[in-house]
């Protein structure tokens, strides 16, 4: 037996032109058992969604940990400074017991600039894809700017592809437990 799940998202034109008007309808077939298993996994906190990030600092200056911008989930490890010619590692995971992905931005200070690193791992791989982006600017970039490629940020790179933005190379695997490699040269 199959259940038809219909998701309709309608974006309404905002008065200040912040979003374009569009409608999207997506229909996906899901077996009843699979749907119930997903719900059960969320309640039992069995759903794995996280991104493990290794930031390689090839520059001559320290990357100072400046904080995070949470979209869904949070950092589950210590967020530390990264000295020159070193690599820092952290993990960002989804919120426990919630049907969300793992998405957010980490910020490092570098020589009066801010390096913002964004990744988004979806909860539902049938409807969404994983995305990554990096931006070096005078101020912190929020999740929305990096995810949508707005306010000076380039459009994000889909997981499974190398990105190269502002002298920073990065690669995000296309998995629910993604690995994110960032190579910062300064």
From Swiss-Prot:
Keywords: Membrane, Nematocyst, Secreted, Signal, Target cell membrane, Target membrane, Toxin, Transmembrane. The keyword Hydrolase does not apply. Its main location: other. One of its GO terms (cellular component) is nematocyst. It holds the Pfam family Anemone_cytotox. Residues 1-21 form the signal peptide. A motif (Cell attachment site) lies at residues 158-160. It comes from the Eukaryota. Expressed female germline during oogenesis. It is found in: Nematocyst; Secreted; Target cell membrane. Octamer or nonamer in membranes. Monomer in the soluble state. In vitro, interacts with folate receptor alpha (of target organism). Pore-forming protein that forms hydrophilic pores and causes cytolysis. Compared to equinatoxin-2 (AC P61914), it reveals lower cytolysis activity (5-12-fold difference, tested on erythrocytes), a larger pore size (probably 2-3 nm) and different affinity to membrane lipids (100-fold lower affinity to sphingomyelin). Binds to sulfatides. Shows cytolytic activity on HeLa cells, with a different potency than its paralogs (from most potent to less potent: HALT-4>HALT-6~HALT-1>HALT-3>HALT-7>HALT-2). Belongs to the actinoporin family. HALT subfamily. This is Hydra actinoporin-like toxin 6. It comes from Hydra vulgaris.
